[in-house]
């Protein structure tokens, strides 16, 4: 790519220069469009639900459902092999009679499997019969797993097979129930099977979600994850579900933190009030059960019959289900091309309810992007129990068409307002230990939280003191909030990834020209700038920061704010970590763009005065998704946690940072304003 200087003074032949011009514009399109273009789908509906018993029980065999070989062996021992050719109910009842005389693990397992097969056959016609048989499967699987009088081998594949039978029988029963009833915590159900009556109370066992948060439920097994590399599941008992959040009282100001149709993981477990004793079938009549809803992000195991048992969980599919919405894919383009239309959309977002005691990690996206760009890292980070037990992840959405210092000012205000809403009494210490993670331009937005402006930032706007600038109240307030600020005392650590600390050569004459054609500058910015120039002739020169109206302009190497940010000393309580992408030497982009990630040169992304710096072999669009970058962020979060936990035990240490936080997002002491004409 030609540099700005070369483009201005080149004496190359016209055809060569035209080719370079075309290449520059093409690079603009590829560079800017790619981050906003995620995968077509994040989750797709399967033709049939995923079922771990499919191969074992020959779901797709020409001869139909068949018991496993070990169950066939049990049937042969009791002379029941010839009873397979029927609906399965008679076979189950005959096997159950043998089992009552000899209640051993093998017959428990065989009864569970035969009952499950019979239930699947009955489900297409007689759903009450199917529910009855699924209930029998649940009881036998439960007894196989937990009856204290049985001797079982946990290394035997049948042990895991019994878990699968329990889970699949419960899921299949829930599918039947969901066709007729809404499963919501706090509700009660009356279920009639062929021979029994069940009183089912649905209870919510999470401290995060409330009964009214549940709008609808989907089965995680119905969906295949497409847009996320790794899928995180936990193996145990229960049915993983996707819960779609109900939009609650919009008058609650905290409601703005949650995106519409947010989905979250749930694991459902059925607990019988009374389980038949060993060797006994479940009697007819009425039975009471609890259908328990657990949050697998906070509850990994539960007590069953005096034993701690892990929950079956799926953390990734609910995330992919939420991301699979066309409206989310439109956000990057809207935020870049027309920042004005972002009004009401920008701000801080959560994918879980606020959790007191957990440290917020705020992830800030880059140019022509949105929080979706963080989902790969987020999915990987929260798979670690230590991370999800101590951290909560927040995301910042902002219009990327405007200069990054304007976005930084808005984020400063939004963080302050969030503190007021979430912790009005200021008693929550975790909110004084925020970690900011910024990719690309988001790193610059984050870095502007780490130091106090003094007059240095204003001097990139004008050499005339601000108290002499004439402007009305709103325009003056905006100037002061954007160009005068203090280091954010709630932020303790920042991580910048693929950040153009010295600008990017891709922000050259051609890309900046194209950006001005693409981006609609916010009307408030235009009116404010026009008023300032009209009221203050001669106070602002051509190099003033006020003349920079788009994000592409703000990322140019000659942007006057970048040297100020490099020279500014960060607050004494602040830690800074840096991650740099470098493409392999043989890559075509490396040969064209030089050493770096293809968009940001190494010399621009590299920093000397940081706590740590990691070089990752990745291009600009993938550096924050690269496994080594994710591992580095996880390492930093563990270090952050260790330092916080160790601090009270160090009597010689001072406070980690000032405890005073300006909740109103005030700037440094305001100078006296000049009168407006």
Task: Label the predicted regions.
Residues 38-102, 107, 113-116, 123-361, ...:
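Flexible, membrane-associating and regulatory peripheral segments of lipid-active enzymes
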Residues 33-36:
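C-terminal motif of bacterial Sec signal peptides marking the signal peptidase cleavage site
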Residues 1-18:
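N-terminal secretory signal peptides that target proteins for export/translocation
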Residues 375-391:
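Short amphipathic alpha-helix adjacent to the substrate-entry channel of hydrolases
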Residues 381, 385, 422, 449, ...:
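Active-site catalytic pocket residues across diverse enzymes, especially alpha/beta-hydrolases
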Residues 70-77, 122, 371-372, 404, ...:
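Short, solvent-exposed loop/turn elements at domain surfaces
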Residues 516-671:
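C-terminal subdomain of alpha/beta-hydrolase-fold enzymes, centered on the catalytic histidine
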Residues 115-190, 361-367, 393-549, 597:
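Serine-dependent carboxylesterase/thioesterase catalytic core
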